[in-house]
Amino acid sequence: MNYSCLQIVCGLAFLFCLASPVTCAVTPLWVQPAAPGDELSGVVISDNGSAIVAGGDQLIALSREGGKCWTAWSGSLLATSRDGRYILMAKGPVVRLISGSGTLLWEKTLDTIITDLSIAPDASAIAVSGGGQIHTFTLSGGSIASDRSLAINHIKIMPSGEQILITTSKNVQVSDLTLLPVWSDNSSTQDFVEITPGGSSIVTATNSRVRMYTANGNLSWEQRLTGGKALALAYASDGSTIVVGMDDTTVQVLAHNGTLLWTANATNWITSVAVSDGGNTIVAGSRDKKVHVFNHAGTRLGIFTVKGPIDPHSVAVTRDGSLIVIVDQTAVYGLSRSSFMPQETVMATIPTPSREMTAFPTMKATRKITPRIMTLPTPPPTETPQASLPSPVPVIAVGLLLLCRFRKT
Protein backbone atom coordinates (compact mmCIF):
# COMPACT_ATOMS: atom_id res chain seq x y z
CA MET A 1 0.00 0.00 0.00
CA ASN A 2 2.82 2.39 0.89
CA TYR A 3 4.57 1.38 -2.34
CA SER A 4 1.45 2.33 -4.31
CA CYS A 5 1.36 5.74 -2.62
CA LEU A 6 5.01 6.23 -3.52
CA GLN A 7 4.17 5.45 -7.15
CA ILE A 8 1.39 8.05 -7.08
CA VAL A 9 3.63 10.72 -5.55
CA CYS A 10 6.32 10.02 -8.15
CA GLY A 11 3.70 10.29 -10.87
CA LEU A 12 2.59 13.63 -9.44
CA ALA A 13 6.17 14.92 -9.49
CA PHE A 14 6.52 13.77 -13.10
CA LEU A 15 3.36 15.66 -14.08
CA PHE A 16 4.75 18.76 -12.39
CA CYS A 17 7.90 18.52 -14.52
CA LEU A 18 5.89 18.08 -17.71
CA ALA A 19 3.56 20.97 -16.96
CA SER A 20 6.22 23.43 -15.82
CA PRO A 21 7.63 25.76 -18.47
CA VAL A 22 11.06 24.76 -19.69
CA THR A 23 13.69 27.36 -20.50
CA CYS A 24 16.26 26.07 -22.95
CA ALA A 25 19.65 27.74 -22.90
CA VAL A 26 20.63 29.34 -26.19
CA THR A 27 24.25 28.61 -27.02
CA PRO A 28 26.00 31.28 -29.11
CA LEU A 29 27.75 30.28 -32.31
CA TRP A 30 30.68 32.33 -31.10
CA VAL A 31 31.69 34.94 -28.50
CA GLN A 32 34.39 37.55 -29.04
CA PRO A 33 35.36 39.26 -25.75
CA ALA A 34 36.45 42.87 -25.46
CA ALA A 35 40.11 43.56 -24.75
CA PRO A 36 40.91 43.77 -21.02
CA GLY A 37 39.84 47.15 -19.67
CA ASP A 38 37.85 48.05 -22.81
CA GLU A 39 34.09 48.42 -23.13
CA LEU A 40 32.08 47.76 -26.27
CA SER A 41 29.02 49.67 -27.50
CA GLY A 42 27.15 49.31 -30.76
CA VAL A 43 27.35 46.92 -33.69
CA VAL A 44 26.72 47.21 -37.41
CA ILE A 45 26.37 44.62 -40.19
CA SER A 46 26.82 45.68 -43.81
CA ASP A 47 23.82 45.29 -46.09
CA ASN A 48 25.37 42.31 -47.87
CA GLY A 49 26.37 40.70 -44.56
CA SER A 50 30.08 40.61 -45.37
CA ALA A 51 31.22 43.03 -42.64
CA ILE A 52 30.46 42.91 -38.92
CA VAL A 53 31.96 45.67 -36.77
CA ALA A 54 31.53 46.22 -33.04
CA GLY A 55 32.27 49.64 -31.60
CA GLY A 56 33.45 51.02 -28.28
CA ASP A 57 36.87 51.70 -26.79
CA GLN A 58 38.31 49.58 -29.60
CA LEU A 59 36.69 48.56 -32.88
CA ILE A 60 36.52 44.83 -33.57
CA ALA A 61 35.91 43.66 -37.15
CA LEU A 62 34.59 40.11 -37.39
CA SER A 63 33.77 37.50 -39.98
CA ARG A 64 30.36 35.80 -39.98
CA GLU A 65 32.04 32.85 -38.28
CA GLY A 66 33.19 35.10 -35.41
CA GLY A 67 36.84 35.28 -36.41
CA LYS A 68 38.60 38.52 -35.53
CA CYS A 69 39.68 40.27 -38.72
CA TRP A 70 41.30 43.31 -37.12
CA THR A 71 41.04 45.74 -34.20
CA ALA A 72 41.80 49.46 -34.22
CA TRP A 73 40.96 52.91 -32.86
CA SER A 74 37.71 53.59 -31.05
CA GLY A 75 34.20 54.51 -32.15
CA SER A 76 30.83 54.51 -30.46
CA LEU A 77 28.90 55.50 -33.62
CA LEU A 78 29.18 53.22 -36.65
CA ALA A 79 27.97 52.95 -40.25
CA THR A 80 29.11 50.91 -43.25
CA SER A 81 28.75 51.06 -46.99
CA ARG A 82 26.48 48.47 -48.61
CA ASP A 83 29.35 46.15 -49.50
CA GLY A 84 31.28 46.64 -46.24
CA ARG A 85 34.32 48.10 -48.02
CA TYR A 86 34.07 51.35 -46.06
CA ILE A 87 33.39 51.86 -42.36
CA LEU A 88 32.52 55.25 -40.90
CA MET A 89 32.98 55.75 -37.16
CA ALA A 90 32.97 58.55 -34.62
CA LYS A 91 33.70 59.05 -30.96
CA GLY A 92 33.57 62.43 -29.27
CA PRO A 93 34.52 65.09 -31.86
CA VAL A 94 36.55 62.73 -34.06
CA VAL A 95 35.22 61.09 -37.23
CA ARG A 96 37.21 58.50 -39.18
CA LEU A 97 36.73 56.61 -42.42
CA ILE A 98 38.51 53.28 -42.66
CA SER A 99 38.59 50.57 -45.27
CA GLY A 100 36.98 47.19 -44.75
CA SER A 101 40.47 45.78 -44.18
CA GLY A 102 41.15 48.22 -41.33
CA THR A 103 43.22 50.87 -43.10
CA LEU A 104 42.69 54.47 -41.99
CA LEU A 105 41.64 56.55 -45.02
CA TRP A 106 41.11 59.87 -43.30
CA GLU A 107 40.34 61.46 -39.94
CA LYS A 108 38.80 64.79 -38.97
CA THR A 109 38.24 66.53 -35.64
CA LEU A 110 35.22 68.81 -35.34
CA ASP A 111 34.57 71.45 -32.70
CA THR A 112 31.56 69.57 -31.32
CA ILE A 113 30.63 66.13 -30.03
CA ILE A 114 29.31 64.00 -32.89
CA THR A 115 25.91 62.45 -32.12
CA ASP A 116 25.00 60.86 -35.47
CA LEU A 117 26.57 59.91 -38.78
CA SER A 118 25.67 58.35 -42.11
CA ILE A 119 27.37 57.03 -45.23
CA ALA A 120 25.84 56.53 -48.68
CA PRO A 121 25.36 52.88 -49.70
CA ASP A 122 28.07 53.29 -52.37
CA ALA A 123 30.19 55.43 -49.97
CA SER A 124 30.04 58.40 -52.35
CA ALA A 125 28.93 60.80 -49.61
CA ILE A 126 29.30 61.09 -45.82
CA ALA A 127 27.51 63.19 -43.21
CA VAL A 128 28.01 63.79 -39.48
CA SER A 129 26.01 65.89 -37.03
CA GLY A 130 26.09 67.10 -33.44
CA GLY A 131 25.78 70.23 -31.33
CA GLY A 132 23.49 71.97 -33.81
CA GLN A 133 25.90 71.31 -36.69
CA ILE A 134 25.84 69.14 -39.78
CA HIS A 135 28.78 68.51 -42.14
CA THR A 136 28.84 66.68 -45.47
CA PHE A 137 31.96 65.19 -47.08
CA THR A 138 33.06 63.34 -50.18
CA LEU A 139 34.48 59.82 -50.03
CA SER A 140 38.01 61.28 -50.03
CA GLY A 141 37.18 63.50 -47.04
CA GLY A 142 36.73 66.74 -48.94
CA SER A 143 34.23 69.14 -47.39
CA ILE A 144 31.01 69.68 -49.32
CA ALA A 145 29.01 71.89 -46.96
CA SER A 146 28.20 72.63 -43.32
CA ASP A 147 25.34 74.24 -41.43
CA ARG A 148 25.29 75.39 -37.80
CA SER A 149 21.64 76.46 -37.61
CA LEU A 150 19.92 73.07 -37.35
CA ALA A 151 19.20 71.33 -34.05
CA ILE A 152 19.40 67.81 -35.43
CA ASN A 153 18.14 64.58 -33.94
CA HIS A 154 19.13 62.08 -36.65
CA ILE A 155 20.45 61.99 -40.22
CA LYS A 156 20.44 59.49 -43.08
CA ILE A 157 21.98 59.88 -46.52
CA MET A 158 19.44 58.82 -49.13
CA PRO A 159 20.30 55.66 -51.14
CA SER A 160 21.03 57.75 -54.24
CA GLY A 161 23.88 59.42 -52.34
CA GLU A 162 22.71 62.80 -53.60
CA GLN A 163 20.41 63.90 -50.77
CA ILE A 164 20.31 63.73 -46.98
CA LEU A 165 17.33 63.16 -44.70
CA ILE A 166 17.34 65.17 -41.46
CA THR A 167 15.03 64.99 -38.44
CA THR A 168 14.93 67.81 -35.94
CA SER A 169 12.93 68.95 -32.95
CA LYS A 170 10.59 70.78 -35.33
CA ASN A 171 10.52 68.94 -38.64
CA VAL A 172 11.74 66.33 -41.09
CA GLN A 173 13.47 67.53 -44.23
CA VAL A 174 15.42 66.33 -47.22
CA SER A 175 18.29 68.49 -48.47
CA ASP A 176 20.88 68.08 -51.16
CA LEU A 177 24.50 67.56 -50.14
CA THR A 178 25.08 71.32 -50.13
CA LEU A 179 22.33 71.40 -47.47
CA LEU A 180 19.84 73.33 -49.59
CA PRO A 181 16.32 72.07 -48.77
CA VAL A 182 14.43 69.91 -51.26
CA TRP A 183 11.31 69.35 -49.14
CA SER A 184 10.29 69.46 -45.49
CA ASP A 185 7.35 68.71 -43.22
CA ASN A 186 7.23 71.31 -40.47
CA SER A 187 4.13 69.99 -38.75
CA SER A 188 5.85 68.47 -35.70
CA THR A 189 8.95 67.15 -33.98
CA GLN A 190 10.67 64.24 -35.73
CA ASP A 191 13.20 61.85 -34.21
CA PHE A 192 14.26 58.34 -35.33
CA VAL A 193 14.38 57.69 -39.06
CA GLU A 194 14.96 54.75 -41.42
CA ILE A 195 14.88 54.42 -45.23
CA THR A 196 14.45 51.45 -47.56
CA PRO A 197 17.52 50.67 -49.71
CA GLY A 198 15.66 51.84 -52.80
CA GLY A 199 14.72 55.11 -51.11
CA SER A 200 11.04 54.80 -52.02
CA SER A 201 9.76 55.09 -48.45
CA ILE A 202 10.88 56.81 -45.26
CA VAL A 203 9.74 55.94 -41.73
CA THR A 204 10.04 58.21 -38.69
CA ALA A 205 9.23 57.44 -35.05
CA THR A 206 8.75 60.19 -32.50
CA ASN A 207 7.36 59.56 -29.01
CA SER A 208 4.27 57.42 -29.72
CA ARG A 209 3.84 58.45 -33.37
CA VAL A 210 5.07 56.60 -36.45
CA ARG A 211 4.89 58.16 -39.91
CA MET A 212 5.68 57.02 -43.43
CA TYR A 213 6.66 59.38 -46.24
CA THR A 214 7.34 58.85 -49.91
CA ALA A 215 10.71 59.90 -51.31
CA ASN A 216 9.06 63.08 -52.60
CA GLY A 217 7.85 64.12 -49.15
CA ASN A 218 4.23 63.00 -49.38
CA LEU A 219 2.89 61.76 -46.04
CA SER A 220 1.46 58.27 -46.65
CA TRP A 221 0.12 57.49 -43.18
CA GLU A 222 0.46 58.17 -39.48
CA GLN A 223 0.04 55.61 -36.69
CA ARG A 224 -0.37 56.48 -33.02
CA LEU A 225 0.97 53.75 -30.75
CA THR A 226 -0.47 53.11 -27.33
CA GLY A 227 1.74 52.93 -24.26
CA GLY A 228 5.11 54.61 -23.97
CA LYS A 229 7.58 56.47 -26.14
CA ALA A 230 9.86 55.17 -28.89
CA LEU A 231 13.47 54.44 -27.94
CA ALA A 232 14.49 52.48 -31.05
CA LEU A 233 13.35 51.99 -34.66
CA ALA A 234 14.12 49.36 -37.31
CA TYR A 235 12.78 49.06 -40.86
CA ALA A 236 13.22 45.86 -42.88
CA SER A 237 15.33 46.37 -45.99
CA ASP A 238 12.52 44.99 -48.16
CA GLY A 239 10.11 47.54 -46.67
CA SER A 240 7.78 44.89 -45.25
CA THR A 241 8.10 45.38 -41.50
CA ILE A 242 8.60 48.24 -39.04
CA VAL A 243 9.71 47.57 -35.45
CA VAL A 244 9.56 50.09 -32.62
CA GLY A 245 11.12 49.57 -29.18
CA MET A 246 9.29 51.45 -26.43
CA ASP A 247 10.03 52.71 -22.93
CA ASP A 248 6.95 50.89 -21.58
CA THR A 249 8.82 47.56 -22.15
CA THR A 250 6.90 46.68 -25.32
CA VAL A 251 7.94 45.87 -28.87
CA GLN A 252 5.41 47.11 -31.43
CA VAL A 253 5.46 45.82 -35.00
CA LEU A 254 3.74 47.41 -38.00
CA ALA A 255 3.20 46.40 -41.61
CA HIS A 256 4.30 48.56 -44.54
CA ASN A 257 0.79 50.07 -44.77
CA GLY A 258 0.85 51.17 -41.11
CA THR A 259 -1.31 48.37 -39.73
CA LEU A 260 -0.26 47.40 -36.21
CA LEU A 261 0.47 43.67 -36.46
CA TRP A 262 1.23 42.86 -32.83
CA THR A 263 2.61 44.11 -29.55
CA ALA A 264 4.87 42.00 -27.32
CA ASN A 265 5.92 42.47 -23.73
CA ALA A 266 9.54 42.38 -22.63
CA THR A 267 10.75 43.04 -19.08
CA ASN A 268 12.42 46.45 -19.36
CA TRP A 269 12.96 49.37 -21.72
CA ILE A 270 13.60 48.29 -25.33
CA THR A 271 16.65 50.29 -26.38
CA SER A 272 17.76 48.47 -29.55
CA VAL A 273 15.83 46.63 -32.27
CA ALA A 274 16.64 44.92 -35.57
CA VAL A 275 14.58 43.15 -38.25
CA SER A 276 15.38 40.91 -41.22
CA ASP A 277 13.70 40.93 -44.62
CA GLY A 278 10.09 39.79 -44.38
CA GLY A 279 10.20 40.30 -40.63
CA ASN A 280 10.97 36.62 -40.09
CA THR A 281 13.55 37.51 -37.43
CA ILE A 282 12.90 40.40 -35.05
CA VAL A 283 15.41 41.16 -32.30
CA ALA A 284 14.82 43.45 -29.31
CA GLY A 285 17.40 44.24 -26.64
CA SER A 286 16.49 45.70 -23.27
CA ARG A 287 18.20 47.42 -20.36
CA ASP A 288 17.86 44.35 -18.13
CA LYS A 289 20.45 42.44 -20.22
CA LYS A 290 17.88 40.38 -22.12
CA VAL A 291 17.60 39.97 -25.88
CA HIS A 292 14.20 38.79 -27.14
CA VAL A 293 13.81 37.12 -30.54
CA PHE A 294 10.43 36.93 -32.31
CA ASN A 295 9.12 35.77 -35.66
CA HIS A 296 6.83 37.79 -37.91
CA ALA A 297 3.70 36.41 -36.22
CA GLY A 298 4.79 37.69 -32.81
CA THR A 299 5.82 34.33 -31.41
CA ARG A 300 8.69 34.61 -28.97
CA LEU A 301 11.40 32.28 -30.25
CA GLY A 302 13.62 32.69 -27.23
CA ILE A 303 15.50 34.96 -24.84
CA PHE A 304 19.27 35.32 -24.61
CA THR A 305 20.80 36.98 -21.55
CA VAL A 306 24.08 38.88 -21.75
CA LYS A 307 26.27 40.29 -18.98
CA GLY A 308 25.43 43.98 -19.34
CA PRO A 309 22.56 46.30 -20.32
CA ILE A 310 21.77 46.61 -24.03
CA ASP A 311 22.59 50.10 -25.29
CA PRO A 312 21.19 51.73 -28.45
CA HIS A 313 22.41 50.20 -31.75
CA SER A 314 23.63 47.06 -29.94
CA VAL A 315 21.64 44.36 -31.76
CA ALA A 316 21.81 43.54 -35.48
CA VAL A 317 20.60 40.81 -37.83
CA THR A 318 21.55 39.82 -41.37
CA ARG A 319 19.00 40.47 -44.12
CA ASP A 320 18.16 36.76 -44.38
CA GLY A 321 17.66 36.56 -40.61
CA SER A 322 20.08 33.67 -40.15
CA LEU A 323 22.67 35.46 -38.00
CA ILE A 324 21.99 37.66 -34.97
CA VAL A 325 24.81 39.75 -33.49
CA ILE A 326 24.62 41.32 -30.03
CA VAL A 327 27.02 43.60 -28.15
CA ASP A 328 27.15 44.37 -24.46
CA GLN A 329 30.01 46.10 -22.65
CA THR A 330 32.00 42.87 -22.33
CA ALA A 331 31.70 40.93 -25.60
CA VAL A 332 30.24 40.42 -29.08
CA TYR A 333 27.89 37.44 -29.42
CA GLY A 334 26.94 35.68 -32.64
CA LEU A 335 23.78 33.58 -32.54
CA SER A 336 22.04 31.44 -35.12
CA ARG A 337 18.33 31.98 -35.53
CA SER A 338 17.90 28.22 -35.73
CA SER A 339 19.08 27.95 -32.12
CA PHE A 340 15.90 29.70 -30.98
CA MET A 341 12.86 27.48 -30.69
CA PRO A 342 9.26 28.77 -30.43
CA GLN A 343 8.16 28.97 -26.79
CA GLU A 344 5.07 31.11 -26.54
CA THR A 345 2.97 33.68 -28.32
CA VAL A 346 3.70 36.83 -26.39
CA MET A 347 0.47 38.66 -27.05
CA ALA A 348 -2.45 38.12 -29.37
CA THR A 349 -2.49 39.99 -32.64
CA ILE A 350 -3.89 43.44 -32.04
CA PRO A 351 -6.21 44.88 -34.69
CA THR A 352 -5.49 48.45 -35.61
CA PRO A 353 -8.17 50.84 -34.37
CA SER A 354 -9.26 52.91 -37.33
CA ARG A 355 -9.14 56.09 -35.28
CA GLU A 356 -5.47 55.53 -34.46
CA MET A 357 -4.05 55.33 -37.97
CA THR A 358 -4.55 58.11 -40.44
CA ALA A 359 -3.86 57.58 -44.13
CA PHE A 360 -3.03 60.71 -46.07
CA PRO A 361 -3.78 61.06 -49.78
CA THR A 362 -0.99 63.49 -50.66
CA MET A 363 0.63 66.16 -48.57
CA LYS A 364 3.60 68.14 -49.71
CA ALA A 365 5.96 69.36 -47.18
CA THR A 366 7.76 72.70 -46.99
CA ARG A 367 11.83 74.03 -42.70
CA LYS A 368 14.13 74.87 -38.61
CA ILE A 369 14.96 73.70 -34.91
CA THR A 370 17.04 72.65 -30.59
CA PRO A 371 19.50 69.97 -29.89
CA ARG A 372 18.31 66.88 -28.13
CA ILE A 373 20.57 63.99 -27.35
CA MET A 374 18.70 60.99 -26.05
CA THR A 375 19.85 59.89 -22.61
CA LEU A 376 18.69 56.75 -20.92
CA PRO A 377 18.29 57.11 -17.15
CA THR A 378 18.74 53.82 -15.35
CA PRO A 379 15.32 52.23 -14.91
CA PRO A 380 14.45 50.54 -11.63
CA PRO A 381 15.38 46.85 -11.44
CA THR A 382 12.62 44.50 -12.42
CA GLU A 383 11.81 41.06 -11.14
CA THR A 384 10.86 38.28 -13.48
CA PRO A 385 7.44 37.03 -12.38
CA GLN A 386 7.22 33.36 -11.63
CA ALA A 387 5.03 31.40 -13.98
CA SER A 388 1.86 30.01 -12.45
CA LEU A 389 1.04 26.35 -12.84
CA PRO A 390 -1.11 25.38 -15.79
CA SER A 391 -4.74 25.00 -14.77
CA PRO A 392 -4.98 21.15 -15.10
CA VAL A 393 -2.11 20.56 -12.67
CA PRO A 394 -3.92 21.52 -9.41
CA VAL A 395 -6.89 19.33 -10.37
CA ILE A 396 -4.67 16.35 -11.12
CA ALA A 397 -2.72 16.91 -7.91
CA VAL A 398 -5.85 16.97 -5.74
CA GLY A 399 -7.19 13.85 -7.44
CA LEU A 400 -4.00 11.89 -6.90
CA LEU A 401 -3.70 12.95 -3.27
CA LEU A 402 -7.31 11.91 -2.57
CA LEU A 403 -6.66 8.58 -4.25
CA CYS A 404 -3.57 8.07 -2.14
CA ARG A 405 -5.51 8.90 1.04
CA PHE A 406 -8.33 6.54 0.05
CA ARG A 407 -5.92 3.66 -0.60
CA LYS A 408 -4.27 4.21 2.78
CA THR A 409 -7.64 3.69 4.49
Positions of predicted regions on the chain:
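A short beta-strand motif characteristic of beta-propeller blades
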Residues: 28-34, 67-72, 103-108, 142-148, ...
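Hydrophobic core register within WD40 beta-propeller blades
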Residues: 43, 78-80, 117, 155, ...
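C-terminal low-complexity, Ser/Thr- and acidic/Pro-rich disordered "stalk" regions positioned immediately N-terminal
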Residues: 339-385
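Hydrophobic beta-strand positions that form the internal "hydrophobic ladder"
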Residues: 51-52, 87, 126, 164, ...
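Blade-level signature of beta-propeller repeat domains, shared across WD40, Kelch, NHL, RCC1
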Residues: 304-348
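Residue-level detector of Asp-centered blade-edge/turn motifs that repeat once per structural unit
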Residues: 45-48, 82-83, 121-122, 159-160, ...
